[in-house]
Regions:
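Short alpha-helical
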Residues: 16, 42, 73
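Alpha-helical elements of the RecA-like P-loop NTPase motor core of helicases
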Residues: 19, 23, 45, 75-76
Length: 82
């Protein structure tokens, strides 16, 4: 049995690409933790420090960052779990 990947999505409620990323993950059966950086300044600072990004979405898959809704990179990192 494969262990599930640890997925964190840094997002904001008004971000359309964030909603698409979350829907994409959900439709494929992946669970994730959603962090609303508009309400969590520390998380916003942490993601900026780790990735250099101030925009969302940023997805961490087992601590490997994916910036934006990059399907190819998301699929590549999740391939071993499908």
């Amino acid at each position: 049995m494969k262990t599930a990947p640890r997925i964190v999505v840094f997002s904001t409620p008004s971000c359309g690409w964030c909603r698409k990323v979350k829907s994409y993950l959900k439709d494929r059966g992946f669970r994730y933790r959603d962090v609303d950086i508009s309400k969590d300044d520390k998380a916003a600072q942490d993601v900026q420090r780790k990735t250099g990004q101030t925009s969302v979405p940023v997805i961490l898959i087992n601590n490997r960052p994916v910036v934006g809704f990059n399907r190819q990179e998301i699929d590549r990192l999740l391939k071993q779990y499908t």
